[in-house]
């Protein structure tokens, strides 16, 4: 999931009139298209997706699937949202339980938990086993904000934060927004544009999109 660092696996790149990147992250097949400076993304499993028109942010799927859209959250923040056909409380419960984070993971990097409290509260810490580029590692997150059925925010050791927000649109429809927030990660890192230069901002944007598309897809399939 995009609570963590993301990177696609088994990626191959080919040049045509546009750039097409294909790969597979966990159970989610994906395809990303770029034309000029415009980022057009298409994600899919068994469903087919189409790119949005140039100049339109987000991911536009076919059929009943919801669009993952770009959210302008300000400098130093990468944010996306999607509408999911499920109650806010149900979706919040997944994010608020680190044991279930692998259900959300669109990157294939989340392996399992090492240490998790029975219930998250502000200040709680939990450790997770990860694997990136074939290398195992672990990461410890600390809960920095928590509002039942509305918000979960966690910080990572480097100083950036991951935030999930749930806006109930109806009893069975929720707008889910996920944000990778590094604006306050430190003057030195920000001055060096650490997250941009290392590719973290870019790869985490892709991870957020994959995770939200996967989440929307799961509930759309269940409704079909």
Swiss-Prot record:
InterPro entries: Polyketide_cyclase/dehydratase, START-like_dom_sf. It comes from Mycobacterium tuberculosis (strain CDC 1551 / Oshkosh). Pfam families: Polyketide_cyc2. This is Uncharacterized protein MT0096.
């Amino acid at each position: 999931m995009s609570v963590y660092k993301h990177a696609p696996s088994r990626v191959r790149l080919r040049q045509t009139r546009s750039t097409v990147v294909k790969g597979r992250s966990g159970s989610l097949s994906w395809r990303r298209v770029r034309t000029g400076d415009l980022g057009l993304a298409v994600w899919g499993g068994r469903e087919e997706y189409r790119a949005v028109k140039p100049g339109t942010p987000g991911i536009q799927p076919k059929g009943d699937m919801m669009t993952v859209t770009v959210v302008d959250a300000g400098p130093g923040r990468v944010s996306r949202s999607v509408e999911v056909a499920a109650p806010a409380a149900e979706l919040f419960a997944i994010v608020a339980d680190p044991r279930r984070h692998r259900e959300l993971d669109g990157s294939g990097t989340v392996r399992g938990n090492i240490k998790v409290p029975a219930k998250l509260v502000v200040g709680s810490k939990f450790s997770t086993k990860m694997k990136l580029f074939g290398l195992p590692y672990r990461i410890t997150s600390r809960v920095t904000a928590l509002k039942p059925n509305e918000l979960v925010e966690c910080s990572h050791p480097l100083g950036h934060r991951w935030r999930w927000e749930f806006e109930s649109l109806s009893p069975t429809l929720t707008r889910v927004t996920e944000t990778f927030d590094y604006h306050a990660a430190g003057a030195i890192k920000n001055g060096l544009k650490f997250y941009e230069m290392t590719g973290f901002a870019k790869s985490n944007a892709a991870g957020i999109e994959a995770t939200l598309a996967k989440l929307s897809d799961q509930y759309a399939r269940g409704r079909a």
